[in-house]
Amino acid sequence: MLQPKRTKYRKQFKGRIKGVAKGGSDLAFGEFGLKAQEPNRVNAREIEAARRAITRHMKRAGRVWIRVFPDVPVTAKPTEVRMGKGKGSVEYWACKVKPGRMMFEIDGVNEELAREALRLGAAKLSVKTRFVQRIAE
């Protein structure tokens, strides 16, 4: 699963996801993509599950780009532990996704296969997405 090799600080504030994606909202590598429609935190497990679903349906043909990276540590306290005594330990890594953010891109397959592969991948994500295609110039 994806996670940073090293970070400046071990733990982070929760924060809020406000506004729309400034960058990373257009197709940069592939012909087809999966674009986020709502703000949410997507964890590393979801990204990996979506990647596996997409590559499995494509039968290793074509190429997949993951445009999001889980760089936010999410902490949790163990169950049945009283409040206080400091912040919990890092449970998993997540990525804050804003609306309009391109999450996955694929190339080297036809539209029908790409649409189905990205639909299967989208089912693994906790954010509403839509299929996008590069417009022919």
Swiss-Prot record:
Any Gene Ontology biological process: translation
Record keywords: Ribonucleoprotein, Ribosomal protein, RNA-binding, rRNA-binding, tRNA-binding
CDD domains (UniProt xref): Ribosomal_L16_L10e
SUPFAM superfamilies assigned: Ribosomal protein L16p/L10e
Residues in the signal sequence: none
Entry keyword annotation includes Nucleus: no
Classification via NCBIfam families: rplP_bact
Its biological purpose: Binds 23S rRNA and is also seen to make contacts with the A and possibly P site tRNAs.
UniProt family annotation: Belongs to the universal ribosomal protein uL16 family.
Subunit structure: Part of the 50S ribosomal subunit.
Descriptive protein name: Large ribosomal subunit protein uL16
Organism: Sinorhizobium fredii (strain NBRC 101917 / NGR234)
Lineage per the UniProt record: Bacteria, Pseudomonadati, Pseudomonadota, Alphaproteobacteria, Hyphomicrobiales
